[in-house]
């Protein structure tokens, strides 16, 4: 039984779920905003905020952890250059989730997640 298991399953096996969240995190950092389902946006928020917190730390160990998660190495370097200046006054809450219209095919709740 899954009593009080806080990990969102997202209807996928663990390996597919991790790969999807890595891809969404990479896209969010690259583009600045992503349109996805509300459940995926909420799961993505945790991962994106963790990567930005690592970038604010700026240590070599943090950079290596981010490189192991984000698919694009050049994007990691850009994130570590920009994040400390952009988010220096924030202690968290680097993303914003805005609900949009439901998806046409299956009426799934959609949301836009963007970097603040």
Curated annotation (Swiss-Prot):
Keywords: Ribonucleoprotein, Ribosomal protein. It comes from the Bacteria. Disulfide bonds: none annotated. GO terms for biological process: translation. GO terms for molecular function: structural constituent of ribosome. The keyword Ribonucleoprotein applies. Part of the 50S ribosomal subunit. Contacts protein L32. This is Large ribosomal subunit protein bL17. It comes from Synechococcus sp. (strain CC9605). The gene is rplQ.
